[in-house]
Amino acid sequence: MGNSALKAHIETAQKTGVFQLTDKGLTEFPEDLQRLSGNLRTIDLSSNKIEVVPPMMGKFSLLKSLSLNNNRISRLPDELCKLKKLETLHLNGNQISQLPADFVQLLALKTLNLSGNRLKTLPAQLFKLRNLDVVDLSKNRIQAIPDEVSGLQAIELNLNQNQISQISVNISHCPRLKVLRLEENCLELSMLPPSILSDSQISLLAVEGNLFEIKKLRDLEGYDKYMEKFTATRKKFA
């Protein structure tokens, strides 16, 4: 991409607070972008060939939305965790295997998409983020839902297409979780805690494509109670 075209994008972003440069074959963050660290509210560099998120990202103090989908990123810098106003973070289609310890500092974060990465565990940092609403961790390599999950504040959790064979009963204690997607995992029916159906807030449980027939779900204790929640939710949005 030519310098003049990049300059034009940066000039526009200076006025709008939005920098969008997708599918341009970029291999690194545009260095001139740091001139706008006090301006930008949105950055979208999706569908490029970026491998490294530079530490300068931590200087974008007003940033609310960051999209780096479909790049070649394998790790996130600690400095990213300084983005106190960040509400939306899209990182699907990268090579990320873990999150920085300081990820817990992203206290404004509401939406996180890490679909199609290399996570093997459910990141514990997510259980400390009080404003998190939607989490997409589908298409990773996660094998279990741990006991600590009860700290998760999300309303929707997508774990489709992982390798999950174990679920902690504590998933039932997530205070706001209404939508749980577990399609195409490695679950036996016996590994599904009945309390997910009877004692949780969950009104949509998607478990198609596991190691049991979906109609067997009806045999679980608490299924009728779950169906009441499911039907009530459907009526609300009808």
From Swiss-Prot:
GO terms for cellular component: cytoplasm. The keyword Transcription does not apply. SMART domains: LRR_BAC, LRR_TYP. Keywords: Leucine-rich repeat, Repeat. LRR repeats lie at residues 39-60, 62-84, 85-106, 108-129, 131-152, 153-175, 176-196, 201-221. Gene3D superfamilies: Ribonuclease Inhibitor. This is Leucine-rich repeat-containing protein 57.
